[in-house]
Amino acid sequence: MLDQDSNARPWLLLAPVLLFLAVLAAAALAVIRMSVGSNGDEWRSVSLSSYADLATPYYMKSLWLTLRLAFQSTVLAVLLAIPVAIAMARAKSKLARRLLLTGVLLPLLVNLLLQSYGWLIILGPGGVLNNSLLALGIVQRPVQWLYRENGVLLGLIQTAFPLAALPMASALKAISGSYEEAAATMGASRWQILRHVLLPLAMPGILSGALLVFAYNASAFAVPLLLGGRRVSMLAVLVRDQITPLLNWPAASATSVVLMLATLAVMALSQKLVHRSQKMLGNTR
């Protein structure tokens, strides 16, 4: 009896997780099924017309815009996260580590809508950013940030920044300081230590953070809707437009499936390229 109880206990602990994954899988299958249905008869009919409609230039432009903004925000978020992650991993003061961690986690703790409204205040014609640029004499008149790609890009970087910084900080913290000391002893500069020692060793964490940021921003909805409006039509916004006024569930589902497949394809390709580059780097050594 004791052996049976001990064998069953891990499954009991996994039951909530398995149930949650089953619900997610069921929801994904429901979306896929509706994507091959007809409007008004989603569950009984079979039609690929919703996918055919996505081949229009309007949807292709939106798909390209979504992937491009997700990629740009990923690159910039990772670059900005490198010094923050190094500071989090190498800070000796416990207070400094806590303050850095709190600052990084803040975007995850504040509601996404509130963050987007905050960006509306910052990026508006009379907002903080424009007033600062005017006061410094950098610009002569307010810059139009809202309802432009640049404004959406800033919002995407800020909201997804923790996803880039946290895995990177964890990977850097696991690297022994003896590597840096050995490189410094051999005359390496700080830039050389960062480029040839820290970044290659932290590449798994960097890649994990980059993939998280890309997947998160490719499916972003609140930020492009509030900061971009109809002028920056990312695919998630088009999904909402198909549902709210039109109730066209097959079209919305097909758009979601295409977005999911495109995101997975880009993530798989990037991971393969990184693994290949790491293998080539290892062979050269």
Residue ranges of predicted features:
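Glycine-rich helix-loop "coupling/hinge" segments at transmembrane-helix boundaries
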Residues: 40-43, 221-247, 284-285
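Short, Lys/Arg-rich, polar N-terminal cytosolic tail immediately upstream
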Residues: 1-7
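Short glycine/proline-centered loop/turn elements that form peptide/ligand docking sites
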Residues: 175-179, 279
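A short amphipathic helical element positioned immediately N-terminal to and/or at the very start
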Residues: 46-55
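Short cytosolic juxtamembrane segments of multi-pass membrane proteins
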Residues: 273-285
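Glycine/proline-centered hinge or cleavage motifs at structural transition points of membrane proteins
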Residues: 186-188, 200
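Membrane-water interface segments at the C-terminal ends of transmembrane alpha-helices
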Residues: 8-40, 57-173, 197-221, 228, ...
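The alpha-helix within a helix-turn-helix
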Residues: 183
